[in-house]
Amino acid sequence: MRDLIQTTGMVLYAAPVGEFDKRLILLTGDRGKITAFARGAKRTGSLLRAASRPFAFGTFTLSETRDAYNLYGAEIENYFEGLEQDVECACYASYFAEFAEYFGREGLEAKEMLRLLYQSFRALLKPALPNKLVQRIFELKIMVIN
């Protein structure tokens, strides 16, 4: 096994691979957009099951392979459960994640984009802020970042 690295990031996308594994696209502050495989993440009782949910934000423990990374553990700080409970918020969050995936680059620092995504998700959960306003601010700021 190669050296383990720890990085702060957010799961943008999760897709099943085989019977028990998941392929994740993470946006990390120091490595940009990366692809990681969570082996056994679909098994009941797996420690990686919750960490491989879309919108999960935290510190991920990974090992680098030739083409991708393998996920070995995570300390999730925020699951953004409120986004999944409101269909409109979930749609906006998915839209923001798609933007981040499109504009994110592998191997390039993405701290500003990660911060923007995190703050936008938090803003979606505040009923006082209209979601349309959050969307417009997100779109403007992501264009400035890139």
Residue positions per predicted region:
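Non-catalytic alpha-helical scaffolds and adjoining flexible linkers that form interface surfaces
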Residues: 1-23, 27-146
